[in-house]
Amino acid sequence: MEVLRVSAKSNPNSVAGALAGVIREKGAAELQTIGAGALNQAVKALAIARGFMAPSGVDLVCRPAFTDLVVDGAERTAIRLMIEPK
């Protein structure tokens, strides 16, 4: 599954386009976020991507999960959003 990392500065429209492309190509994708701002951008991107995919009859579902990552030598808690067609 391809992992798309989302930051608080990510453009939701750009993330949505990438997300829709990965799902069309590979069937599923994962958004990885650290922090509330990044999670906010990821959820907006998911809503936009759902709109991109709806005309072709594809609905998206999201399964959130916590995960621990090592960033610059420090352990951080991240939220993963596993996205797949319904």
Predicted regions and their residues:
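Flexible, active-site-adjacent loop/turn segments at secondary-structure boundaries
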Residues: 4, 32, 51
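Charged, well-structured alpha/beta interaction segments
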Residues: 24-41
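Residues that cap or initiate secondary-structure elements
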Residues: 10-12, 37, 68-70
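An N-terminal amphipathic alpha-helical segment
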Residues: 1-29
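C-terminal edge-of-domain segments
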Residues: 54-86
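Short, low-complexity, polar/charged sequence segments that are solvent-exposed and flexible
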Residues: 23-26, 49-53, 80-83
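Short, hydrophobic/π-rich interface segment
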Residues: 36-60
